[in-house]
Amino acid sequence: MNDKQLVAIEAAKLATNGMLIGLGTGSTANYFIEALAERQTKEGLNIQTVASSTISAIKAQNCGLALVAISQINQLDLYVDGADEITPKLSLLKGRGQDLVMEKLLATAAKQFVVVADKSKLVSRIGEKFVIPIEVMPNAWQMVKQQLEKHGGNGDIRLNASQDNVAISAQGNYILDMT
């Protein structure tokens, strides 16, 4: 069992009966979903979940977790997600998986936001290992990019996996990858 699995299992212990739980996106979030589903099965937990991405929703359904649409909630009891980078002051870089808006909405709606990560995510400053993703409306990406450049940012629009078109977020937006 790796460190990500161990921290995900610990995070799943925070779930209690009747909770509405937000599910993050990524490899560590997947371990959390599995651990949460295992607790539900073994302990008979009555919980509902809200997924931050289509891939997490599919994972949750495959694991037997009940899903609620974000449009049906006002607040979450708990939101658990991973991070791409974490500084000593607990600043986080998230969103390399293109689900920035949903992750931010769920984190903001949660009474408790728990980030599960192993030591490989620790950095001295945000942007040390990865570019900083910024989700923008398609009709405003150039304006946003210019404004960020005025403040010292540098970067460009993210391309899809085939490198032949613009990458589109789950919400239909573009992503600027900035340094």
Can you name each region flagged by the protein language model?
Residues M1-G82:
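N-terminal active-site beta-alpha-beta segment that forms phosphate/nucleotide-binding
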